Amino acid sequence: MDKSSGELVTLTPNNNNTVQPVALMRLGVFVPTLKSLKNSKKNTLSRTDATEELTRLSLARAEGFDKVEITGPRLDMDNDFKTWVGIIHSFARHNVIGDKVELPFVEFAKLCGIPSSQSSRRLRERISPSLKRIAGTVISFSRTDEKHTREYITHLVQSAYYDTERDIVQLQADPRLFELYQFDRKVLLQLKAINALKRRESAQALYTFIESLPRDPAPISLARLRARLNLKSPVFSQNQTVRRAMEQLREIGYLDYTEIQRGRTKFFCIHYRRPRLKAPNDESKENPLQPSPAEKVSPEMAEKLALLEKLGITLDDLEKLFKSR
């Protein structure tokens, strides 16, 4: 629904864009590859609290689940995200029978953004590991009281089967999660920016997060962007990665921004977003935001902010704490 006009807007995926559930884009399910040799060799397990976003699903509401967690192997941007895009496209563009969809393997590879010129062996080497990681990602819904616990455990994709000789791919989804694939708070994600950011996974990850935000988003804290990337390096190194990724997004023409400071917290003010990487005919529709002037902070408040920073507590953490009360 377009809030300004009241018009119902249908979002349809094609080769240049895909409909992505907002929850998966904001939560950091898909993150950059760990570049450090020490970290990259670890069988890294990712654990994400998805309670705030996914308790809105009808499954959670009907069963009274009040906690949702996504657990599984670390899903990267360069291969796993593109495979997930192919899965979303497959269910959107092909006939779903029961809980399964079937399509030619070569077409599925194209939907994943893999050139058809690649050999069958190279296709398998890219798609097979990604399908295993995505199918190995667990979503658990639970509710616990003083005496009992209820829990429903499922997967991002229930099963995947492919046969390159017969040229088929079969994908199976949990019917109770179809709503996740067609989330009512979804956005149309342009793939043009993703393609312009090849091998720049941090910039790709921040793009999917920023593009999921509503129009005229509030300033985004540096800490929130660090959390979205879910890196394991020291904080100062993570800050450099975030700033470099934001600059890369500006270089391809996706956005413009200003970095500001309020107290001891750094923020990014997004002036505009251009997923097509070109200016619209009417630039006034972008509603550029002017950076807010830095607020004066009293010495007492500055001491409190400094203490929170030493403890590793961010303003986002405090906001979540107050919301949970």
Swiss-Prot record:
Annotated organism of origin: Salmonella typhi
Keywords: DNA replication, DNA-binding, Plasmid, Plasmid copy control
Pfam families (UniProt xref): Rep3_N
GO molecular function: DNA binding; DNA-directed DNA polymerase activity
Name of the featured protein: RepFIB replication protein A
Gene: repA
Biological process according to GO: DNA replication initiation; plasmid maintenance
Similarity-based family: Belongs to the initiator RepB protein family.
Recorded superkingdom: Bacteria
Job description of the protein: This protein is essential for plasmid replication; it is involved in copy control functions. In vitro, binds to the DNA repeat units, BCDD'D'', EFG and HIJ.
InterPro entries: Initiator_Rep_WH1 (IPR000525), WH-like_DNA-bd_sf (IPR036388)
Region (Disordered): 279-298
